[in-house]
Amino acid sequence: DALQPYAKVITGKAKTMDGFFKVHYVDGKYFFEIADSLFGRDILIVNRVVKAPVDAQKRKVGYPGDYISDEVIRFEKGRGDKLFVREISYLEHSADTLGMYQAVLNSNVQPIVATFPLKTVRKEGETTNYVIDMTDYIRKDNEMFSFTSRVKDNIGASSMVDDASYIDTLKAFPQNIEIRTVRTFQRKKGGGSGLEKLLAAFFATSTTPLTYELNSSMLLLPKEPMKPRLHDDRVGYFAVSYKDFDENPQGVKYKANITRWRLEPKDEDREKYLRGELVEPKKPIIIYIDPVTPKKWVPYLIQGVNDWQAAFEKAGFKNAIFGKEAPTDDPTWSLEDARHSAIVYKPSDIPNASGPHVHDPRSGEILETHINWYHNVMSLLYNWYIVQAGAIHP
């Protein structure tokens, strides 16, 4: 279609939200207005469960807050009146000042995963803003804003039920866009976990559709990544692996960067920090407590987080980490917002806890963590205590 005048697309009825790009809601449609200054910038998309089906607890994504997937994308101007979205991989590295760079680049073409026809264009000084209609792409089934094929296989989902799936809310902020959708899937015959597949071979299984409420966070990553720190196998850190083509001129070196929080001294405290004095970080780590956590546990979870302050003092930072109750009077706060870290309460019989995190794949910077605290974790701690200390307990 030919480009339309801006006022004909973004009419006076538009509800506009200002984020790192503008989002317009007009007559049931969501338009993204993307400045050309954002072309080539890395945007991290993180997908999580907000609400899960009644019988999903034994599956990979069966509880609110469960992580689904993440990927890095970039917008770019395509041929003609089109905007492209590329999915970006950081599995292979070569510096742009060295001889291998172009060869590595030619062997790592980043795939175009979506194309959007331009609806209109707006000039704003030296900047050109491109407007695309994202409604159908967000609402329909795709791995960017929904389940990956692997997760769908795990939960036993097949095709999405179009008329039972919709965009619930979309909100824009300076560093992120939050999209909430409701998605209903037909059950895959004989799908789901290994046990479900085995039972399906002998018994009739439910044909009731699966309805999930999902949240997708689009985070604008820093233009300059945090300085990475190389992984050392002798030290117990999680790490991001990649192939390096520069260090060995006659071979390939497999390297990894540790994942770590971006704790930096304030500019005015840098000299104190370098002298070994304790200083407060520019941005402390805040771990919120899931608002649905039973109230009797909240003070102890907060204290458990705060107890880690002593460990960070060994690294030169005081007041580096805090546990806090989730705000109940802030309508913009959400447990699924990928800017926020949280301890998430899971009403589950799983006797465990886990601490997965989301990081910047370029540097290993931890952006947030959702620590899973399962209701039945006390049985694990009890059994550990009996095994390890039962023989000497008075």
Predicted segments — roles?
Residues 1-293, 311, 320, 326-394:
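Auxiliary tRNA-acceptor-end handling modules of aminoacyl-tRNA synthetases
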Residues 306-317:
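Sec-exported extracytoplasmic/periplasmic mature domains
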Residues 297, 301-304:
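Stable alpha-helical elements in mature extracytoplasmic
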